[in-house]
Amino acid sequence: AVIETINREQQLSDISASPYRFQRKDYEPVDTMLHQMGTPIKKCGLVRSAFRPSDDTSTYQFHIPANAMMLTELQSIAEILLSLNIETDTAQKALKIAGEIERAIYKYGVTRDLNGNPIFAYEVDGFGNVLKMDDSNIPSLLSLPYLGFVKKDDPLYLNTRRFVLSDENPYFFKGSAGEGIGGAHIGINYIWP
């Protein structure tokens, strides 16, 4: 059921086709979705995620860190199933989806910092719009090596890390008591441990 749900949310070309709806009567825009569905997306191989790990709504519904985590978990599922020689069709489907996600991350989820260096975007929509930031939750851009998506010395990751830990990231804060990453959920000028 999980792989079918991932595949369904990956194959959307129109968000109104998704069975998932959410609307909260609230005053904070980060707490609910635009017209119960969120912002438009274009099918591109990534899996839709209406919410961030912080439980704030996504600006663009393809969350790159979550997609990276999903592909590594799909690869792990396939490895386990194949090693046990069970559910080989499910394993092959998981590997196919993981491959599609990986290609889409590198095609749609890579952008440039202010110096022109390639970095991973935080969120994208498939139309070419990107959100350049990071949030201190996991999965996050900083956690990509921890998730097993990239090596910690990968040049693209190192560029992304430099971006995330700089004032180019709107949620990187520096003060007299410390510096670090926060997020929209906690607000401006707050870091999360």
Predicted regions and their residues:
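Active-site acid/base region of carbohydrate-active enzymes
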Residues: 1-59
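Residue-level preference for alpha-helix termini and adjacent loops
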Residues: 46, 50, 61-63, 141, ...
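Short, well-ordered coil↔helix boundary/capping segments
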Residues: 64, 138, 154, 184-191
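Catalytic cores of carbohydrate-active enzymes
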Residues: 3-24, 62, 69, 75-155
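An acidic intrinsically disordered interaction segment
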Residues: 23-43, 106-109, 153-167
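Generic long, charged, amphipathic alpha-helical segments
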Residues: 165-193
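Short glycine/proline-enriched loop/turn "hinge" motifs that connect secondary-structure elements
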Residues: 39, 63, 178-182
